[in-house]
């Protein structure tokens, strides 16, 4: 990879001055149709070096796509209409024939659960919106791996996202989504590094519980069901009424298994059935 320095800029400026005109300027590797823009590009680089105090610049493997600054500004101001990521997620879900009704159920349930944890996260509203968006996208793409195989589909889905090229997403963002999908079921040991991040844990536990509550692929019954994080930030608590547990015995069984899964991590999940109706 090449490196641009001030000495290099001075050398190029001298070559341009000696040439007198772009038509007579010669430089190995420069195509004829690029010559007219060299002077302007050199001026911009000089200004950047001076204004930003840059000592050297390294060339990158890619380039900024058209409109990326407007896209990033829209994200900061939470303007959904300028953020391409949601559009890309929808397109990817369609490409892998995701059950959109189920994805929507899981998404809405995960967001409802996550909103119960936001007080303990103690984050600004703009940051909470960002976390909700990423949780929504993970829920929408939860089942993309089923197109490959229903066995270990969460692993296939994580692999797809880790290797996808989705406009608007950075590689770290895609990896975070892949880890949410990978961890939405099964053992938590595979996510030990990520479980040090409180934000990630709140997203993950919301997604795992949403998948459980929507396991029958129908609208979950959230009446008589509550979820919160205790004042001790490593403990989460589920509570349901006795009548809820009687109506949904399979969900109760799955939730109890979920509590056992979290026992093997640094985070704890409890499940209590109240004596009330």
Which role does the model predict for each range below?
Residues 1-217, 223-238, 242-246:
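Helical "lid/coupling" subdomains associated with nucleotide-phosphate turnover
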Residues 225-276:
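Charged substrate- and nucleic-acid-binding regions of tRNA-handling and nucleotidyl-transfer enzymes
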